[in-house]
Amino acid sequence: MGLRRAVGPAIRSTGVALAAGLVMVLVALALGIGEVSRVHAALGAGTFGAIAMSALQITAAPNFGLWALSFAAGPGFQIADGASTTWSGSRGALMPLIPVFAGLPQPGDFPRYAALAVLIPLAIGAYAGHRAVGSIARLSSVRSKVEVALVTALLTAAALALLDLIGGGALGRAKLGNLGAPTGWFFLALLAELALGAVV
């Protein structure tokens, strides 16, 4: 019963998580709009090229949202080998000349309160738990409620990790051969945080 009841809430929670990730991306872009605009202008791509580049970045927006979620969850993400962003800070390296990446924080250590980003997946977990408990009878046992909440957290974390795995890739070889979130750690961190939020 727990699995069947958890599917609907997990789908909704996955959508909420993706939306939260996209909001984080938009906030980062707003804070770094000057640098993003500078890189965009430096490309000198012309009208058609600018449209194509914008379309490419919009298409990749769900990926960026997942990377932002991975940052909030703890594992962080990398754009290139040596260029990573985690709670501890941003590490610079050779970066692809893509405007949206200019919205990343400048290399350096982050303040300790950056770890408060974990409140985002915890809140998503709380939402997932609320939806999960609402999918079963009000008089169900506490055990049944906890079970469906945990299964919902598991399905949500698995769905997000699968989307990250499918959307991951490379922009070339060597330093650009791996980008995005570390899927395994992303899944484990999300599972723990969503589960905690779901049952609290």
Predicted region positions:
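Membrane-interfacial segments
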Residues: 27, 31-35, 132-140, 167-175
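Cytoplasmic membrane-interface segments at the C-terminal ends of transmembrane helices
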Residues: 1-9, 29-30, 123-150, 196-200
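N-terminal membrane-targeting/anchoring modules of bacterial envelope and secretion proteins
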Residues: 1-42, 47-51
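Alpha-helical transmembrane spans of integral membrane proteins, capturing the lipid-embedded, hydrophobic core
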Residues: 6-22, 118-123, 149, 153-157, ...
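C-terminal TM-helix exit segments that contain a strictly Trp-centered aromatic cap at the helix terminus
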Residues: 20-31, 66, 70-73, 156-168
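Extended hydrophobic-aromatic, low-complexity segments
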Residues: 80-81, 112, 126-128, 160
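Long mid-to-C-terminal scaffolding/interaction modules that assemble large complexes
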Residues: 141-158, 163-181
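Long, glycine/tryptophan/cysteine-rich extracytoplasmic
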Residues: 35, 43-117, 165-200
